[in-house]
């Protein structure tokens, strides 16, 4: 039973709570290419899947409302919730992720292991408080009127910070 497995993981201390943290990820694919990203949390009130929404976090595909109740039922009695949601940013000046790549040596390594089935290798690093603040500032900069004008040639419109690239229904269920 999946809930029993979750309880077991919680009891055994498999998971570590990292309040107010961000985790920088480097995933080396089996072909040698490295993908970079961040793991964190978002304000669910900043998300809206309604077409034409002006929310900071928006869906990139239609949300099928019938898919939400089954997902909610599965999660109802779950002791933990760990859905994957991939959020995309439009950061042409490389202000968010790239500074972290150069500074990963300053971060605490949380994990570093090979993935199964030739999936490559993954490393996760906990950002310092200073780096978390820098990421927050960089993300805020992406929503400025100046940034919207530079990227899209528009101003005075509701900025888009994150586009949901995968996991839209999981985010809608949350």
Q: What are the language-model segments listed below?
A:
Residues 1-118, 126, 149-152:
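N-terminal extension/subdomain marker
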Residues 116-137:
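Glycine-rich phosphate-binding "P-loop"
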Residues 141-174:
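Active-site beta-strand/loop microenvironment that shapes enzyme catalytic pockets
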Residues 79, 127, 131, 162-169:
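Short, contiguous, pocket-lining structural segments
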């Amino acid at each position: 039973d999946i809930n029993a497995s979750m309880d077991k993981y919680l009891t055994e201390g498999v998971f570590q709570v990292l309040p107010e943290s961000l985790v920088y990820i480097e995933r080396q694919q089996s072909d040698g290419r490295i993908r970079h990203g961040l793991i964190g949390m978002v304000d669910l009130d900043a998300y809206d899947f309604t077409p034409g929404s002006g929310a900071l976090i928006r869906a990139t595909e239609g949300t099928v409302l019938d898919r939400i109740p089954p997902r909610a039922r599965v999660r109802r009695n779950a002791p933990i919730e760990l859905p994957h949601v991939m959020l995309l940013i439009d950061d042409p000046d490389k202000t968010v992720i790239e500074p972290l790549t150069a500074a990963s040596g300053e971060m605490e390594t949380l994990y570093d292991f090979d993935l199964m089935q030739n999936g490559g290798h993954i490393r996760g690093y906990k950002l310092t408080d200073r780096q978390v603040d820098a990421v927050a500032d960089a993300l805020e900069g992406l929503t400025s009127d100046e940034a919207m004008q530079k990227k899209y040639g528009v101003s005075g419109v509701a900025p888009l910070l994150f586009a949901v690239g995968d996991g839209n229904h999981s985010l809608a269920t949350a």
